[in-house]
Protein backbone atom coordinates (compact mmCIF):
# COMPACT_ATOMS: atom_id res chain seq x y z
CA UNK A 1 0.00 0.00 0.00
CA UNK A 2 1.44 3.36 -1.03
CA UNK A 3 1.66 6.39 1.17
CA UNK A 4 -0.98 8.30 -0.80
CA UNK A 5 -3.43 5.38 -0.66
CA UNK A 6 -2.90 5.07 3.07
CA UNK A 7 -3.60 8.78 3.53
CA UNK A 8 -6.78 8.51 1.47
CA UNK A 9 -8.02 5.60 3.60
CA UNK A 10 -7.23 7.48 6.80
CA UNK A 11 -9.01 10.62 5.61
CA UNK A 12 -11.97 8.51 4.51
CA UNK A 13 -12.38 7.24 8.06
CA UNK A 14 -12.45 10.66 9.71
CA UNK A 15 -15.86 11.49 11.25
CA UNK A 16 -16.09 14.94 9.70
CA UNK A 17 -19.48 15.79 11.18
CA UNK A 18 -18.30 14.92 14.68
CA UNK A 19 -15.05 16.80 14.12
CA UNK A 20 -16.85 19.94 12.95
CA UNK A 21 -19.34 19.64 15.81
CA UNK A 22 -16.47 19.32 18.30
CA UNK A 23 -14.78 22.47 17.02
CA UNK A 24 -18.10 24.33 16.99
CA UNK A 25 -18.88 23.10 20.50
CA UNK A 26 -15.51 24.26 21.85
CA UNK A 27 -15.87 27.67 20.20
CA UNK A 28 -19.47 28.06 21.38
CA UNK A 29 -18.75 27.05 24.96
CA UNK A 30 -15.65 29.26 25.05
CA UNK A 31 -17.70 32.24 23.86
CA UNK A 32 -20.54 31.51 26.25
CA UNK A 33 -18.37 30.94 29.31
CA UNK A 34 -15.71 33.59 28.72
CA UNK A 35 -17.96 36.38 27.50
CA UNK A 36 -20.75 35.45 29.91
CA UNK A 37 -18.41 35.64 32.89
CA UNK A 38 -17.13 39.08 31.94
CA UNK A 39 -20.60 40.35 31.00
CA UNK A 40 -21.94 39.41 34.44
CA UNK A 41 -19.01 41.19 36.07
CA UNK A 42 -19.69 44.28 33.94
CA UNK A 43 -23.37 44.21 34.87
CA UNK A 44 -22.52 44.12 38.56
CA UNK A 45 -20.21 47.11 38.11
CA UNK A 46 -22.84 49.16 36.24
CA UNK A 47 -25.46 48.46 38.92
CA UNK A 48 -23.02 49.41 41.66
CA UNK A 49 -21.90 52.66 40.04
CA UNK A 50 -25.12 54.04 38.57
CA UNK A 51 -28.30 52.31 39.71
CA UNK A 52 -27.96 51.80 43.46
CA UNK A 53 -26.45 53.64 46.42
CA UNK A 54 -26.97 50.82 48.91
CA UNK A 55 -25.21 47.45 48.61
CA UNK A 56 -28.16 45.67 50.21
CA UNK A 57 -30.29 46.65 47.21
CA UNK A 58 -28.22 44.47 44.89
CA UNK A 59 -26.71 41.98 47.36
CA UNK A 60 -28.98 39.22 46.04
CA UNK A 61 -27.96 40.06 42.48
CA UNK A 62 -24.28 39.76 43.43
CA UNK A 63 -24.90 36.32 44.94
CA UNK A 64 -26.80 35.17 41.84
CA UNK A 65 -23.98 36.42 39.60
CA UNK A 66 -21.41 34.52 41.65
CA UNK A 67 -23.47 31.33 41.42
CA UNK A 68 -23.75 31.70 37.64
CA UNK A 69 -20.01 32.30 37.38
CA UNK A 70 -19.28 29.08 39.27
CA UNK A 71 -21.73 27.26 36.99
CA UNK A 72 -19.80 28.67 34.02
CA UNK A 73 -16.56 27.17 35.36
CA UNK A 74 -18.16 23.74 35.64
CA UNK A 75 -19.82 24.04 32.23
CA UNK A 76 -16.52 24.81 30.53
CA UNK A 77 -14.76 21.81 32.08
CA UNK A 78 -17.61 19.38 31.43
CA UNK A 79 -18.16 20.51 27.85
CA UNK A 80 -14.48 20.09 26.98
CA UNK A 81 -14.43 16.55 28.38
CA UNK A 82 -17.74 15.58 26.79
CA UNK A 83 -16.70 16.98 23.41
CA UNK A 84 -13.54 14.87 23.45
CA UNK A 85 -15.53 11.76 24.39
CA UNK A 86 -18.05 12.34 21.61
CA UNK A 87 -15.27 12.83 19.08
CA UNK A 88 -13.64 9.60 20.23
CA UNK A 89 -16.99 7.80 19.92
CA UNK A 90 -17.32 9.20 16.40
CA UNK A 91 -13.93 7.81 15.45
CA UNK A 92 -14.90 4.46 16.95
CA UNK A 93 -17.89 4.11 14.66
CA UNK A 94 -16.18 5.05 11.40
CA UNK A 95 -14.54 3.09 8.67
CA UNK A 96 -11.19 3.55 10.39
CA UNK A 97 -12.20 0.77 12.80
CA UNK A 98 -13.03 -1.59 9.97
CA UNK A 99 -9.82 -0.74 8.13
CA UNK A 100 -7.74 -1.56 11.20
CA UNK A 101 -9.52 -4.55 12.65
CA UNK A 102 -11.15 -6.18 9.67
CA UNK A 103 -14.84 -7.05 9.60
CA UNK A 104 -17.07 -4.69 11.52
CA UNK A 105 -18.05 -6.49 14.73
CA UNK A 106 -19.70 -4.66 17.55
CA UNK A 107 -20.47 -5.86 21.03
CA UNK A 108 -23.57 -5.25 23.09
CA UNK A 109 -21.47 -3.02 25.32
CA UNK A 110 -20.39 -0.92 22.33
CA UNK A 111 -23.98 -0.44 21.20
CA UNK A 112 -25.04 0.47 24.74
CA UNK A 113 -22.29 3.09 24.90
CA UNK A 114 -23.49 4.60 21.62
CA UNK A 115 -27.10 4.63 22.84
CA UNK A 116 -26.01 6.27 26.09
CA UNK A 117 -24.21 9.03 24.21
CA UNK A 118 -27.32 9.63 22.09
CA UNK A 119 -29.48 9.99 25.20
CA UNK A 120 -26.98 12.26 26.99
CA UNK A 121 -26.52 14.41 23.90
CA UNK A 122 -30.29 14.75 23.52
CA UNK A 123 -30.64 15.78 27.18
CA UNK A 124 -27.79 18.27 26.85
CA UNK A 125 -29.29 19.64 23.64
CA UNK A 126 -32.60 20.33 25.37
CA UNK A 127 -30.76 21.92 28.31
CA UNK A 128 -28.70 24.17 26.05
CA UNK A 129 -31.84 25.23 24.18
CA UNK A 130 -33.12 26.49 27.52
CA UNK A 131 -29.79 28.24 28.15
CA UNK A 132 -29.98 29.76 24.66
CA UNK A 133 -33.46 31.13 25.36
CA UNK A 134 -32.42 32.41 28.80
CA UNK A 135 -29.31 34.14 27.41
CA UNK A 136 -31.57 36.19 25.14
CA UNK A 137 -33.00 37.98 28.20
CA UNK A 138 -29.94 40.13 29.06
CA UNK A 139 -29.47 40.85 25.35
CA UNK A 140 -33.04 42.18 25.24
CA UNK A 141 -32.51 44.29 28.37
CA UNK A 142 -29.30 45.81 27.06
CA UNK A 143 -30.81 46.32 23.63
CA UNK A 144 -33.68 48.24 25.23
CA UNK A 145 -31.18 50.35 27.14
CA UNK A 146 -29.11 50.90 23.99
CA UNK A 147 -32.24 52.03 22.13
CA UNK A 148 -32.95 54.49 24.93
CA UNK A 149 -29.39 55.77 24.60
CA UNK A 150 -29.99 56.42 20.91
CA UNK A 151 -33.12 58.34 21.87
CA UNK A 152 -31.08 60.39 24.35
CA UNK A 153 -28.67 61.37 21.59
CA UNK A 154 -31.56 62.40 19.36
CA UNK A 155 -33.23 64.45 22.11
CA UNK A 156 -29.90 66.08 22.99
CA UNK A 157 -29.60 67.34 19.44
CA UNK A 158 -33.13 68.81 19.61
CA UNK A 159 -32.79 70.08 23.19
CA UNK A 160 -36.29 69.09 24.42
CA UNK A 161 -37.57 66.41 26.82
CA UNK A 162 -34.08 65.42 27.93
CA UNK A 163 -34.88 64.70 31.59
CA UNK A 164 -37.97 62.65 30.75
CA UNK A 165 -35.99 59.78 29.22
CA UNK A 166 -35.06 57.15 31.82
CA UNK A 167 -33.90 53.58 32.23
CA UNK A 168 -35.39 51.78 35.24
CA UNK A 169 -33.54 48.62 36.28
CA UNK A 170 -36.31 47.77 38.74
CA UNK A 171 -38.85 46.99 36.03
CA UNK A 172 -36.70 44.07 34.84
CA UNK A 173 -36.46 42.54 38.31
CA UNK A 174 -32.75 43.32 38.57
CA UNK A 175 -33.30 45.51 41.63
CA UNK A 176 -36.13 45.63 44.20
CA UNK A 177 -38.72 48.37 43.84
CA UNK A 178 -37.47 50.14 46.98
CA UNK A 179 -33.95 50.47 45.57
CA UNK A 180 -32.59 53.99 45.39
CA UNK A 181 -32.36 55.48 42.86
CA UNK A 182 -33.12 52.34 40.81
CA UNK A 183 -33.33 54.36 37.62
CA UNK A 184 -31.22 56.91 35.78
CA UNK A 185 -32.43 59.82 33.67
CA UNK A 186 -31.15 62.75 31.70
CA UNK A 187 -27.49 63.56 32.22
CA UNK A 188 -26.85 60.44 34.30
CA UNK A 189 -28.24 58.24 31.55
CA UNK A 190 -26.19 60.05 28.93
CA UNK A 191 -23.07 59.49 31.04
CA UNK A 192 -23.77 55.75 31.24
CA UNK A 193 -24.44 55.54 27.52
CA UNK A 194 -21.05 57.07 26.79
CA UNK A 195 -19.09 54.70 29.03
CA UNK A 196 -17.00 51.91 27.54
CA UNK A 197 -18.28 49.53 30.23
CA UNK A 198 -21.84 49.70 28.90
CA UNK A 199 -20.84 49.14 25.27
CA UNK A 200 -18.48 46.32 26.19
CA UNK A 201 -21.00 44.56 28.43
CA UNK A 202 -23.70 44.81 25.75
CA UNK A 203 -21.46 43.26 23.11
CA UNK A 204 -20.26 40.58 25.54
CA UNK A 205 -23.85 39.49 26.12
CA UNK A 206 -24.38 39.32 22.36
CA UNK A 207 -21.30 37.11 22.08
CA UNK A 208 -22.63 34.97 24.94
CA UNK A 209 -25.92 34.55 23.09
CA UNK A 210 -24.06 33.59 19.90
CA UNK A 211 -21.96 31.09 21.85
CA UNK A 212 -25.08 29.40 23.22
CA UNK A 213 -26.50 29.20 19.68
CA UNK A 214 -23.28 27.64 18.37
CA UNK A 215 -23.33 25.07 21.17
CA UNK A 216 -26.93 24.11 20.38
CA UNK A 217 -26.04 23.62 16.70
CA UNK A 218 -23.01 21.53 17.68
CA UNK A 219 -25.08 19.27 19.95
CA UNK A 220 -27.73 18.80 17.26
CA UNK A 221 -24.99 17.80 14.82
CA UNK A 222 -23.59 15.40 17.40
CA UNK A 223 -27.02 13.90 17.93
CA UNK A 224 -27.64 13.33 14.21
CA UNK A 225 -24.24 11.76 13.63
CA UNK A 226 -24.47 9.58 16.75
CA UNK A 227 -27.95 8.38 15.77
CA UNK A 228 -26.79 7.55 12.26
CA UNK A 229 -23.74 5.69 13.56
CA UNK A 230 -25.84 3.77 16.07
CA UNK A 231 -28.25 2.70 13.33
CA UNK A 232 -25.34 1.37 11.28
CA UNK A 233 -23.84 -0.44 14.26
CA UNK A 234 -27.14 -2.04 15.25
CA UNK A 235 -28.84 -2.82 11.96
CA UNK A 236 -26.24 -2.81 9.20
CA UNK A 237 -23.14 -4.27 10.85
CA UNK A 238 -23.52 -7.56 8.93
CA UNK A 239 -23.34 -5.80 5.58
CA UNK A 240 -20.23 -4.48 3.91
CA UNK A 241 -20.75 -0.93 5.05
CA UNK A 242 -19.19 1.59 7.30
CA UNK A 243 -20.00 5.00 8.68
CA UNK A 244 -18.47 8.17 7.45
CA UNK A 245 -20.74 10.67 9.10
UniProtKB/Swiss-Prot annotation:
Q: Which organism is it from?
A: Squalus acanthias (Spiny dogfish)
Q: Where in the cell is it found?
A: Membrane
Pfam families associated with the record: Myelin_PLP (PF01275)
**InterPro entries assigned to the protein according to its UniProt record, in alphabetical order:** Myelin_PLP, Myelin_PLP_CS
Q: Name one GO molecular function term.
A: structural constituent of myelin sheath
Q: Name one GO biological process term.
A: axon development
Protein name as it appears in the record: Proteolipid protein DM alpha
Tissue-specificity statement:
Highly expressed in white matter in myelinating shark brain.
What family is it from? Belongs to the myelin proteolipid protein family.
Residue ranges crossing the lipid bilayer per the database entry: 19-35, 71-87, 117-133, 204-220
Amino acid sequence: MGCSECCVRCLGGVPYASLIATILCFVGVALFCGCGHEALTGTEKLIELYFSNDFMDYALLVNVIQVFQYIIYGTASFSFLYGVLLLAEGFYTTSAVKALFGEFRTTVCGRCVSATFIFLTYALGVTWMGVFAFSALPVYIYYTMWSTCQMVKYVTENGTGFDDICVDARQYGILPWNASPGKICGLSLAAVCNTSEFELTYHLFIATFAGAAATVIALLTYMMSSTYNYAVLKFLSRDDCCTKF
